[in-house]
């Protein structure tokens, strides 16, 4: 935007005129309170004079018009890339960033007052908020060499403290001679005068004049390095750094948000007056690094400024270079309609088969479109897709989740048996220094706008209730220690669980196999069930695949070929469309795809991030895609009416819409097509069939929740025993049993089958054509004991 002109090299190439010198001298105490007087020949003064000349040019009028007035606080966002051609400014920012930014603020102060016909004292200090500054630095590289340097870091907000006033300047009055001494506290370090400087008065007692205090809003945040970043090291505790926010920067972020912080690296003495002797002297030399924030950029700032990308589910400031955009364009152009299959097989290539399960997880990675996320007058509709994989041990469920967390631009992987309720949602911790309570984000909040993979989901039954709100309302409400707040948790939950007993029992429902409530299970858009059944041909291919992975001597297709491992079946035609067609289309062919090479993880991560940031597909009404989804949903509702329960609700229709939007996002399309709807129906049919089929292969929609026939039989037998005690008899007719089943709301399709199973098990005995005796009743037992006497 600007060029050097006559100031190539160091600042001070032009002489300072009298008007500029007088103006800078008037505002200088506001920006440099620690300096006793304005020195026109000083380095900072000469830099400020050059900046006054620069900002007086017509090119700078657009920049100065962006001065933000937030009450008594004025700030000016400045894009560093617009000043990158001015070497004298970049050198000044590199040598002494604090001095350069204050000089820039003083220069802007003069120009703004002149352009608005204001007196220099009519406006307060203007803070320069420099953003888009060079390349971000990994937290592991932030060491002593960067002290007093200007850096940019990215991370997830882990903790936010309360806003407090910080004293910058205060007058003290001597108790003996009543002389007033102004004191300036650099970096907020409170340092009262030691002794009175008046001759003849050596008093050491001073009274702070609190009415003269100059205050500033102050807040501390802690950011943590991104878990999915390229610089992240496995097995190491994630690095964190404290950031100090002041004035207009306070309350600009909440726990769980991804922020880009530009600031000056500073050090603070970690000395605490504890212990004694050698330990005390050793602690005096310890320092820790922290950032004095100059600017903070996050999704909330972008959304407030009208940027729709932040509100549409972006992963937050994912930078795309020209090479990245060229790769995305060429990849889409080269594969065309086959992009979904290419991405699906690039995701977790070490797992053999499971095409439809991988398809569901891939759609969850791309996600749907969130509606009404910014409008406060409407209820937000979530766009994130939740999926759970249930099955026997050893089928690769954990590897699928780890692969999803690895390729996601923002993914977090946790294990259920080591996760607490607070660690999953949000915790309230007490700061040891200030004794204040603050929020500390858990896994769901840290995975905001990303993926949260929860393994061993069945081992954390106590924490299931904490997920109900986070999965549907996309937020976590907390009311602890006097703090009441709601934190965003716009994340897709991918869960993996082992059934009770180690083996999935088709005779039981999904709820009974997992010990999961029906309310939580209904929040999952997709439920996949993997069964381990012996198959000679399939086992041979799986063993070949595993050996090829370990030997590393196979061809490119040997280690990456896919053959479906889920047993095939033939669902009834009235249940829905055939679901083997999509699996066969997604499967790699040994001949046609022998040269298939998976997409590398970093490139796949870039593609997913671009799709979520810039592609927002919609379903138009009327359209073939909308008609197809509506017809499938109405058919499911019609079939579920015949069952005792009604598990097919509007949530299934919303799930279909989200999946269809995610399928369109994979192909970078803005409109959902009929082919997208058909593929989504195939995946949904797979999920519904696995969830609702019983041990005989019969589809029963009531099995998606509630109790199995075994539990219903126990409930019916318990009711019979109670009736024996109440009515003083142990024989019942079939009509009486039918009436009893209605009274206890027994949810079975065939009561005769339940009665027959109880008869075969010996709990009841048939005494006639329609008469049964309850053998297990206490009434029958007491009668037998009396007759024996």
Swiss-Prot record:
Q: Where are the zinc-finger regions (C4-type) in this chain?
A: 174-201
Report motif location: Arginine finger. 522-525
Q: Which SMART domains match?
A: AAA (SM00382), MCM (SM00350)
Enzyme class at the top of the EC tree: hydrolase
Q: Which EC numbers characterise this protein's activity in its record? A: 3.6.4.12
Localization: Nucleus
List, in alphabetical order, the GO biological process terms annotated in this UniProt record.
DNA replication; double-strand break repair via homologous recombination; female meiotic nuclear division; male meiotic nuclear division; pollen development
Ordered alphabetically, the record's keywords are: ATP-binding, DNA damage, DNA repair, DNA-binding, Helicase, Hydrolase, Meiosis, Metal-binding, Nucleotide-binding, Nucleus, Zinc, Zinc-finger
Q: Which positions does UniProt annotate for ATP binding? A: 391-398
Q: Which GO terms describe its molecular function?
A: ATP binding; ATP hydrolysis activity; single-stranded DNA binding; single-stranded DNA helicase activity; zinc ion binding
**Pfam families cross-referenced by the UniProt entry:** MCM, MCM_lid, MCM_OB, WHD_MCM8
Catalysis performed (reactions)? ATP + H2O = ADP + phosphate + H(+)
**All residue ranges annotated as the MCM domain in the record:** 339-546
Which Gene Ontology cellular component terms are annotated?
A: MCM complex; nucleus
Which family does the record assign? Answer: Belongs to the MCM family.
- Main function: Probable DNA helicase that may play a role in DNA repair durin meiosis.
This chain's protein is named Probable DNA helicase MCM8
Organism whose genome encodes this protein = Oryza sativa subsp. indica
